[in-house]
Curated annotation (Swiss-Prot):
GO terms for biological process: translation. The keyword ATP-binding does not apply. Binds 1 zinc ion per subunit. It comes from Frankia alni (strain DSM 45986 / CECT 9034 / ACN14a). SUPFAM superfamilies: L28p-like. Keywords: Metal-binding, Ribonucleoprotein, Ribosomal protein, RNA-binding, rRNA-binding, Zinc. This is Large ribosomal subunit protein bL31.
Length: 78
């Protein structure tokens, strides 16, 4: 194996915009990483996840094709 090809790991502090901080190891030399989201404030981990209908895609689909009722036949071959 080649010597001196692997980067050195440093103690690194991760600062989140929510105010949470934690320490990990990283190859980042200055020892500080600023993150926008972390496990303390990310909606998936906090249970506050929302499903967004961006741009009204469902409504647009229903306008184009209409809303079908269960058991209603869709137009077929002639």
């Amino acid at each position: 194996m080649k010597a001196d090809i692997h980067p050195t790991y440093h103690e690194t502090t991760v600062n989140c915009t929510c105010g949470s901080t934690f320490t990990t190891r990283s190859t980042k030399e200055n020892g500080v990483v600023n993150a926008e989201v972390c496990s303390q404030c990310h909606p998936f981990y906090t249970g506050k996840q929302k499903i967004l209908d961006v741009g009204g895609r469902v409504e647009k689909f229903e306008r184009r094709f209409g809303r079908r009722r269960p058991g209603e036949k869709v137009g077929g071959a002639k």
